[in-house]
Amino acid sequence: MGAACPRRPIGARILPMVIYCFDPERGRRWTERLTGIRPQFACVLGFTETALIPGISAAGLTPEARRFTALGDGEVLLAGRSARLPSAPEGYPSPVVISRAVVELLGLPVRVFDAGLPETCKDAVHLGGSPARCLSTGRALAPDTVAHLFSQGLAWGERLADEGGYLAIGECVAGGTTTALAVLRALGHAADGLVSSSHPRCNHTQKGALVDLALQKADLPIDASALAILAALGDPAQPAIAGMAIAASHRVPVLLAGGTQMLAVAAVAERLAAEAGLGWRPEQIAVGTTRWVAADPTADAALLAARIGVVPLLAAALDFSHSRHPALQAYERGYVKEGVGAGGLAIAAELAGIDSERLLAAIDDWLDRWNLPTPV
């Protein structure tokens, strides 16, 4: 396992909910600049048929339900309601409950982007992408689609940076930790056994075998471009988020709100920026996840971040042990862990001055309201 994730002070002020997991010096500098500032939040939704493989993901009650996980999360983010709250097979709720609670608590501006869903998300910004085929095909996305999504991400990154503050970017892609593993391996990073998942124990053997098959089918040359890697093995959210992060980071700090999937985005963004001659500002970027990912005994996010070596990894020390909802207490047993920007937004709440007790109360209160009738 990699290095532990110690808690660190920032100057005279201690941020008790922020854990610095990799590159703590850069992480402290990044958070110090943003204390007292609220972000704008962008969440990119996508779908990969990889999610339909039984057992590959727990981001949905059934494999078929995973077609609509991102749709439900997007609806909750935008409206606070959905016809269905996505949940794990055991019934534990999506981490969107954390994200939406922070959005309401801080009054954050939210944009949801549809990079490629099977069904349209109402009120989302449509980027003109498409769902990905299963990565086992070695032809997940059309190269033109990847290039278009990257271009759209760049354009939106510039536009969002114009609005000031800093930008937190989340994602929702069921099966996305597996596409992340595939992209990381194709980029040359030793990521096997390190990625997290929505399962309480990560299904490394299943993921690894699928990625082995995908790499064999893709038959990428050793000098394959980042766009070619994403076309062969990726999902539609990855090029869009990478473009957003690259463009926005030229002007404002960027928080990639997620775990394994956002570490993969950071790695591919570095390569994309170099190949496109766009300039790379890693000092402007941090990845922010949850303690449940950082402390996952069946993965190692800190070691993965160190092997990638691109940006600091932070984690929110959010604790559901004392939640009044047993379904949230299950997060402490390794279920769900992260998604929809949950960890990064919990860090944003801390930076904005919200303590852990107030944040937990807001999340509990939000889930209390979930069963109320939908307003007409």
UniProtKB/Swiss-Prot annotation:
One of its GO terms (molecular function) is nicotinate-nucleotide-dimethylbenzimidazole phosphoribosyltransferase activity. Pfam families: DBI_PRT. HAMAP family: UPF0284 (MF_01086). NCBIfam families: nicotinate mononucleotide-dependent phosphoribosyltransferase CobT (TIGR00303), PRK04447.1-6 (NF003373). Belongs to the UPF0284 family. This is UPF0284 protein glr4139. It comes from Gloeobacter violaceus (strain ATCC 29082 / PCC 7421). The lineage of its organism: Bacteria, Bacillati, Cyanobacteriota, Cyanophyceae, Gloeobacterales.
